[in-house]
Curated annotation (Swiss-Prot):
Belongs to the metallo-dependent hydrolases superfamily. Hydantoinase/dihydropyrimidinase family. It holds the Pfam family Amidohydro_1. The modification Phosphoserine is found at S529, S536. One of its GO terms (cellular component) is cytosol. It comes from Rattus norvegicus. GO terms for molecular function: filamin binding; hydrolase activity, acting on carbon-nitrogen (but not peptide) bonds, in cyclic amides; phosphoprotein binding. Necessary for signaling by class 3 semaphorins and subsequent remodeling of the cytoskeleton. Plays a role in axon guidance, neuronal growth cone collapse and cell migration. Homotetramer, and heterotetramer with CRMP1, DPYSL2, DPYSL3 or DPYSL5. Interacts with PLEXA1. Interacts with FLNA. This is Dihydropyrimidinase-related protein 4.
Length: 564
């Protein structure tokens, strides 16, 4: 695997921007790390100097959600680890978190090793991995424990959609969340009501709707919002931190915001697409263009969605930005030319993310430069526990840096992007703010518009469990949440008998008291108790009335059942 030799760099005159402060200072980089920050630095002679006067020095962007190797119908995405990370660096992103998705019959551990092998040989920037859980069975528990203990993974994703492929039941999700909490990891959810989506898909196909518009029509906003609410409910019951991937609609974003205000430990991830474009393109007369927008949950056709999501991102109700970058060529998308359910899902956004967020949030006056750093790198590094190695400009942090020109403008176009696909879903969008220099592992990889990347130079960044940013609140709540039963005397009043429905195949009805309650005969012999753990009694063979009248003296007998 190629290993790049780090440059020794002096960055002069820039404005250093972190999530909590901005200040003017020079910065010296050596051995891939930030070694000095300040004025009048004493540095070796003959080193490369970068003039950053009038520019900002930011932590390199962290894209929390990519799918550069996601298999769909046997096809792999057009932008693999090499091309995808090259595009990331071109846009100012210096680290990605990719999703491992195991094929049928492949274990989580084996899939993780496949992803590591592909990324280690091809990634141009540092990376880490989330692991998706498409199927839940007993051995999954041991696999999650091994991934956390030995492989540096601290985040797992479950699906509430894709029925009959990887959709989990609510009970399974509760079980998985409880395990993830005990392991100190972060539970991620793809939130859509898969049952409703499947029924809507059938209905639309029966009506003869086969084009990309069928995709958005079969995934209405409500099925995303409902699933987010359900995921929040389950996570709250399990006291597990929750991370909602791909927040695409106002309804879903509002659910996250409301839960956050109720004190639920929940994080929401809007993506480049939901912040920078809208779903009106699903009705384009150009099938290939419309198909390029197909992803789940879909990009919302409501043109006010992006403005709403950027407002929630600016207020802190949503905390991070990803891209969900997973691109397919027009020929690959055309597998679903006669059936929208077969169009491979995936869109671009890895290269455009930083500029789109700056344009929509900072240039529009919704957030300042510090909040921009928080939502593009720092919060992600804190949630997934690689802060301050990444996401901060500080002595000792990795030298993953972006020299940012807030005044530069560019128009996004498929003609000039660094992707292997014919369409760009942000075609024609003009962005203020773009990187002029990008530094990865202390080495200049973008300068004067020239990309100088090294496939395989990216390192895997292992992550520890129990990130403070996420788990301090969870731990405190665990201590406060111990449940104790109410001490009571023994209930010795009457118990109504009920007829339980017959078990399949038995042909007879079973008579029993309500489960867990003790049934007593009219006269109780304390020395010959008929109580058994099964709920049956010693005199069950004697025919009795199904109810009996209890005679009691005026005012009631003094026992546990009296109201006094």
């Amino acid at each position: 695997i190629p290993r790049i030799t780090s440059d020794r760099l002096l960055i002069k005159g820039g404005k250093i921007v972190n999530d909590d402060q901005s200040f003017h200072a020079d910065l010296y980089v050596e051995d891939g790390l930030i070694k000095q920050i300040g004025e009048n630095l004493i540095v070796p002679g003959g080193i490369k100097t970068i003039d950053a006067h009038g520019l900002m020095v930011l932590p390199g962007g962290v894209d929390v959600h990519t799918r550069l190797q996601m298999p769909v119908l046997g096809m792999t995405p057009a932008d693999d680890f090499c091309q995808g990370t090259k595009a990331a660096l071109a846009g100012g992103t210096t680290m990605i978190l990719d999703h491992v998705f195991p094929d049928a019959g492949v274990s989580l551990l084996a899939a993780y090793e496949q992803w590591r092998e592909r990324a280690d040989s091809a990634a141009c920037c540092d990376y880490s991995l989330h692991v998706d859980i498409p199927r839940w069975h007993e051995s999954t528990k041991e696999e999650l424990e091994a991934l956390v203990r030995d492989k540096g993974v601290n985040s797992f994703l479950v699906f509430m959609a894709y029925k009959d492929r990887c959709q989990c039941t609510d009970g399974q999700i509760y079980e998985i969340f409880s395990l993830i909490r005990d392991l100190g990891a972060v539970a991620q959810v793809h939130a859509e009501n898969g049952d409703i989506v499947e029924e809507e898909q059938k209905r639309l196909l029966e009506q003869g709707i086969t084009g990309p518009e069928g995709h958005v029509l079969s995934h209405p906003e409500e099925v995303e919002a409902e699933a987010v609410y359900r995921a929040v409910t389950i996570a709250k019951q399990a006291n597990c931190p929750l991370y909602i991937t791909k927040v695409m609609s106002k309804g879903a974003a509002d659910m996250v915001a409301q839960a956050k205000r109720r004190g639920v430990v929940v994080f929401g991830e809007p993506i480049t697409a939901s912040l920078g474009t809208d779903g009106s393109h699903y009705w384009s007369k150009n099938w290939a263009k419309a198909a390029a927008f197909v992803t789940s949950p879909p990009i919302n056709p409501d043109p006010t969605t992006a403005d709403h999501l950027t407002s929630l991102l600016s207020s802190g109700d949503l905390q991070v930005t990803g891209s969900a970058h997973c691109t397919f060529t027009t020929a690959q998308k055309a597998v679903g030319k006669d059936n929208f359910t077969l169009i491979p899902e995936g869109i671009n956004g890895i290269e455009e993310r930083m500029s789109v967020v700056w344009e929509k949030c900072v240039a529009s006056g919704k957030m300042d430069e510090n909040e921009f750093v928080a939502v593009t790198s720092t919060n992600a590094a804190k949630i997934f526990n690689f802060y301050p190695r990444k996401g901060r400009v500080a002595v000792g942090s990795d030298a993953d840096l972006v020299i940012w020109n807030p005044r530069a403008t560019k128009v996004i176009s498929a003609k000039s992007h660094n992707l292997n696909v014919e369409y760009n879903i942000f075609e024609g969008v003009e962005c203020r703010g773009m990187p002029t220099v990008v530094i990865s592992q202390g080495r200049v990889v973008l300068e004067d518009g020239n990309l100088l990347v090294t496939p395989g130079a990216g390192r895997f960044i292992p992550r520890k469990t129990f990130p403070d940013f996420v788990y301090k609140r969870i731990k405190a709540r665990n201590r406060l949440a111990e449940i104790h039963g109410v001490p009571r005397g023994l209930y010795d009043g009457p118990v109504h008998e009920v007829m339980l429905p017959a078990k399949p195949g038995s042909g007879t009805q079973a008579r029993a008291s309500c489960p867990g309650k003790i049934s007593v005969p009219p006269v109780r012999n304390l020395h010959q108790s008929g109580f058994s753990l099964s709920g049956s009694q010693a005199d069950d063979h004697i025919a009795r009335r199904t109810a009996q009248k209890i005679m009691a003296p005026p005012g009631g007998r003094s026992n546990i059942t009296s109201l006094s």
